[in-house]
Structure formats: C-alpha cells, structure tokens
Amino acid sequence: MAQRLSSPTSVSSTSVASVRVIPEQILAEWRKWGLSSQPDTILSIKGGLTNQNYLIVSDGVELLLRLNNTATSLGIYREEELAIHQHMAKAGLTPTLRYYSPELEYWVRDFIPGTTLAAAPSSDDLQAVTEVLSIVHAQSPRSNLHTLDIQAACSQYLAQCDGHSEAVIKLKEEITQLVPLPAEDACLCHLDPLPANWLRDSEGKFWLLDWEYAALAHPALDYAALQLQLPENKQALFESFIPENLRDVMANARTQVRLLDRSWRLAHATG
C-alpha cells in the first residue's frame, strides 16, 4: 500500500542511467512492440521498488518497458493486474499496453512524458485525483477479482519475518485489534495511489499507473493511502474532497493502511 511502490514514468537527468541490463531475448522481440527498427537508446528509470522500468527509444518513438518481479512473496496477482490495466486503459485512466509476454514476464506501453504528483499539490490537483479515484471505484473490469483482507495480508507479510522480533510481536498485536471496514462497500481499488504512481501529462491530465496491488477493497483505503503521503498541511484539504459517505471511516482506513505498510516493510527489510 502506501510507499510500497514507486515507479515514476517521467524522466529527468537524475532519474535515468544509460544501462543495458534488459535480457537479450527480450530485446530481440522489439518487432512485437510495433517498432520499425531495433532500439537505439535504453535508459534505466530509477525509483521502482518492485519492478524494473526502462525507457526504450527507436527512431524517435519512446516506449516504457517494465520487467515484472515474479516473487510470490509480493502477493501480486499478475493476471488480475493485466485485466485491470487493460480495462483502465480503455477507460482512459492508464496508458495502453502495446505488448505483454505470454508469461507476463514483461510488458511494453507508450511512454508518456510528464511529472508525478507534486510534493505540495495544489487544491485543483487534489480535487482532480480524488475524482479519478471515484471513477476507478465505479469500474468493474472482471467478476473474479480477489478481495483484499488486510489482516490476512499483514499476517502473510509478517510470516516472512522473525516471529520473535519485538517489532513483529507488537505489530501482530495491533493487527488483532483491527476493526474491519464494511464489506458491503467493497469495490475495485488501486491500493497504491501514492504520488509517484500519478502522472500529469503535458495537457494536465492525470494518469494512474501500476495496478499491481489492485483488488476489491473498501474505497476509503485508496484515499487513506494517498492522504498519508501528502504534507500535513494538505491532508485536511484533501479530505474535504473525499466523498462524504466515507469520511466517518477515514481514521480506521488510515490505521489499516499504516499497518499494512509497516508489515510490508518489515517483511522486505528482513526478507
């Protein structure tokens, strides 16, 4: 959830390195990506905590290639992510994929120049992203998506840790005290809408990227995940744009987001 992923797709001189580490067998498939000639420039995009992202350039055409992390410990459902991504692309909320490998080892999409959500977003920015999240929550990409169980997800992450660790013991105790959010309100949620996963293009449109952790869940979790990443002086303003029917459960949602994030971090600090 919050801060678990960071895969910015805007490129500056400090965020790329000219490194060729994409496997040759993948680069050999460039014709499948709709290119007329093999790539002449490959730039590694820094920032991804889960996957590896590359800017591919061929005769002025810019693509983004993402090598997917296949570790099962991440709790990622790649086939679901693909279905959700394709649905969201049709809805105009995320960039369209040009190609994905049969094993979902990697996929390629158009590179969209832009910037991530600012560290101190404006009121208009905050209103715009809450509107996008509301659209996301109204989507139904497929009928058999898994449902996020916060307690189960936290327990799965902590099972990868030293069970005798004081931090793990304390966190397990906090998890047992969680109050579930109303199950009847569950809908499609992104579940990782932190600032780095928002891209504002040159026309001012916001795109929402990286749907790895998307699942059926309570919509307040999406708003909480983003809210916790905003400066404190922006959090109250952001909450004013959240649908009124969710505001009573926002404190609970923030607690759940924090616990899931801490569990994930403990697992990946020791795993």
What is the role of each PLM region?
Residues 5-20:
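Intrinsically disordered, low-complexity terminal tails and inter-domain linkers enriched
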Residues 14, 165-170, 263-271:
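ATP/Mg2+ or Mg2+-diphosphate-binding catalytic cores
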Residues 19-38, 139-191, 196, 202-203, ...:
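An alpha-helical support segment within catalytic cores of ATP-dependent transferases
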Residues 44-145, 183:
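ATP-binding pocket architecture of kinase catalytic cores
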Residues 44-58, 64-65, 176-221:
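Active-site acidic catalytic loop and adjacent metal/ATP-binding pocket
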Residues 75, 187-188, 201-252:
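Active-site Asp-x-Gly
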Residues 215, 246-248, 261-271:
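Helical subdomain adjoining the active site within ATP-dependent kinase catalytic cores
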